[in-house]
Amino acid sequence: MKRLLLLLFTIHCSLFTFCNPVDDLLERIDKGASAKFKIEKVKSQTDFFELDQQGKKVVVRGNTWVNIASGVNWYLKYYAGIHLSWNQMQAKLPATLPAVKTKERHETDLTLRYDFNYCTFSYSMAFWDWKRWEREIDWMALHGVNLPLAIVGEECVWRNMLLKLGYSEEEIGKFIAGPAFLAWWEMNNLEGWGGPLPLSWYQRQEKLQKQILARMKQLDMHPVLPGYCGMVPHDAKAKLGLNVADAGLWNGFQRPANLLPTDSRFSEIATLYYNELTKLFGKADYYSMDPFHESNDDPNIDYAKAGDAMMQAMKRVNPKAVWVIQGWTENPRPAMVDGMKTGDLLVLDLFSECRPMFGIPSIWKRDEGYKQHPWLFCLLENFGANVGLHGRMDQLLDNFYSDKRNCQGIGFTMEGSENNPVMFELMSELPWRPEKFTKEAWIKDYVEARYGVEDAAIEQAWMILVNSIYNCPAGNNQQGPHESIFCGRPSLNNFQASSWSKMKNYYDPADTKEAARLMNSVAEKYCGNNNFEYDLVDITRQALADQARQQYQHTIADYKGFDRQRFDQDAARFLEMLLMQDKLLGTRAEFRLGHWTQDAINAGSSAAEKKLYEWNARVQITTWGNRYCADTGGLRDYAHKEWQGLLKDFYYPRWKAYFEALAAQMKAQTAPQPELLGGGPNATKTAAELFQMALPQEVKLDYYAMEEPWTLQQNPYTVAPEGSPVEVARQAMDLINIY
């Protein structure tokens, strides 16, 4: 009987699914791959994975499915020369896998590996379906993530809660934000922008979150669900009689109100929230809350009591639950957390590679770190999902291998994913590498793993990159990559594209140009190598953007020197470079606007929904908000992208209009002005005033008036790449070399 049951179980596994989630993952990488591995899950108090050999099969052993998946990834990189990343999550494995000749074991005491920033869910994941989420969870498992933030569908919880509190569907629609802006609603920054959401959206996201949570748990991950810290609609005082604090504005947006955790009705509202959350998505061992996010200290708030009230509300759901909180600017406020019990709070040191708070020098240094509370060393890396090569390799390694008392793990806290895979690969390996190493030694192995080949030119290109653009120095606190000149609103002093990048020059543009030259010099040899072609386009894109910044400076110098002929030539060259960038990026689906807008359109089930979601997608990456929020609030171009389609149809018209306005102004200065004969209205001006008038003047254009119409359009952008990456990269290099 036992044999029969075993036989039936084996048949069931082979017909319907594989017998463990890592085998399933291997099959998604390459059909038939699971037959080449032997997966062994064993009990251990230590987090580990082992690589071993048993006959023709590679053995991957570990104490959790995630750790085993990490071992699979290690083997694929360093034995098989296969690198899986966002641009390539499938690969053809060799018929016979390279043997593990000597057993290899990796252990770590950094047992928690976190993933995601609230912003990631809007800047990258706003319109993802299950198929895309499944790939992401595979990526997470392969890179050791076992503590992922899981906030998809939070709006479903809020809708149910608000209905029970007496809010109408129309009122709820004015409170909950649209798909591309949910993250900032969840962080208590804004209300309603991008909405109202249709009922089908709530149904879609509830189903999606349940699929996400099931897969995460199957892989031994511990999802971090959103907790409750007092957010209520701004009209909650009038509607519900709640004693709330007006949170004011956030970059021009009306913020939701705050029900103070010390209020007598806080427990009631929090209980209602957690009940609805549990009904939909179950209980969790970790809950995320970030009260008072990016807000000034309020003398009317007793932060210690507020923290205790939020903690108690969470503990009523699960007495063993841990509160996960971001270490960002003034948060978590010491007054709120100093009295909390060790183990009840887990702090994400959000920007550890640049602005660590855990006790080593930085502008955000806390002399005592987070005191008794455990925390995670996190890589922020990216803001706004901007496109650009960037990293802080030396800072990352130096900070990680410093004294980190109470550190329990690492975290990926990027605002946008699907960029700079080299930095995320490096970060994911740190828990498994107890001894400090150099970026130069590591990059050699990375390059061989990423492309599956050894090549001196490629290695030289990457050595240049890791010692220049991927090595932003300590003291430079810029937020994310060097922003492309193409993406900024034009002006005489254009430097950064967004309002808050804090960008500084820290590498020589000649370095990215030389790295691009080296990659292009061997491009024909690696035509068809997916990872190589992705990096070839990305590195050449960076070189072209860097050279275009110099071309811009030449053009503005022509204007200031009143050299009309050279101005016309240099302006035309700049615009030619911009259009070449558009063409280059069109050769890869990842860099096409269509992959973003089409996901938005596909999320809709009716023409009206498709229109709303596409508008959300277009606004987020351009104006971000209405005129006031874009201009006065400063949000315009925060999420700018060097993407095919966006360059040609959004950024190009801005620059063309600007250069035409400058040319017209130069022409006007050469025209006769008889009204000024004898001094005219200038007769009474001082010499200093006349001198200022004689200087080259800025032109004033209403950029928002140019930008908003594009956000309202519905012209299609395709996903499918156009042209050969190798051929178009060569054309881009030819253009770079001319200038």
Enumerate the language-model features and the residues they cover:
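Catalytic-core regions of glycoside hydrolase
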Residues: 83, 87-97, 116-120, 141, ...
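Second-shell loop/turn segments in exported
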Residues: 57-62, 122-127, 199-200
